[in-house]
């Protein structure tokens, strides 16, 4: 714990240093540097304020401990002990709050996301489950006050999705939905199953932070763009002009096709938005994989092939395999009531980071 408080003191020292720098005329005259340092100071202000309060509380605890060694009447002794009990409770709470504030911040947490849902193993049933997941996330987003835009979709004849791409915008979307990347398994009796047997199918979900030009610089020379005619479910012809767009990022081989928008220009813009996010995610994931090779994380935010959750319809049960969470309220989860699952994942991630922070 001493190392932890050494880190905390270093943050407090940096805060003081930033205060001095921000009053330096040379820094004030450099607006870009001034804004950068102001942001850094703002990011650690709450941590330093709580740390200062923590030091005041521990000082009061020491004073009360000393008082108890003096000759006090019964009433005074009881008052000091009661005060000490409250101070120790406050100290424990402050330690918890400070530890949370000291956890490494994910720079993408405030971003909007691009979510890709694919029907995987299981044919028509997998595509129908992909549609169910789309509805689940859409309802959850609505509960959060977020906006959902369908960027592209590839429908099947049974009303499911081979693939659907969403852009979800709002407050801290990535911070809550980043844990959804992975393979989602469903166990239920398909509508086409006459014998009433339970089948297992899979859909995969990919969650990427929406990337801006400032996040990643993609050279236009690295992109090959092809245009083709749009087609609907089952090959139905939609557009006689070549409005659909396929973009290939040559250095990574990432391909994005877009045909859901009304014009080639709109498809180009949307394809570029998705491509930027995928390329950003590609390089971020590569860095994360190198990091994870050193520290194995239980609550991952990446590999789409990793089975993360099972939805058992006959037993109305959902299980998140990463944290061993089982809820017997699948009907409510599929209706967008995801808070209990997501909150548990956030807490597990925080606990893991906390343990790492105190052990380092």
From Swiss-Prot:
Q: Which domain of life is it from?
A: Bacteria
Q: Name one GO molecular function term.
A: translation release factor activity, codon specific
**Any one of the GO CC terms:** cytoplasm
| Keyword terms of this UniProt record | Cytoplasm, Methylation, Protein biosynthesis
How does it get modified after it is made? Methylated by PrmC. Methylation increases the termination efficiency of RF1.
Q: Where in the cell is it found?
A: Cytoplasm
UniProt cross-references to SMART domains, sorted A to Z: PCRF (SM00937)
Mark the residues carrying the PTM N5-methylglutamine: 236
Q: Which Pfam families match?
A: PCRF (PF03462), RF-1 (PF00472)
PANTHER family reported in the protein's UniProt record: LD18447P
By sequence similarity, the record places it as follows:
Belongs to the prokaryotic/mitochondrial release factor family.
Function field: Peptide chain release factor 1 directs the termination of translation in response to the peptide chain termination codons UAG and UAA.
Protein name (record): Peptide chain release factor 1
Organism per entry: Lactiplantibacillus plantarum (strain ATCC BAA-793 / NCIMB 8826 / WCFS1) (Lactobacillus plantarum)
What's the name of its gene?
prfA
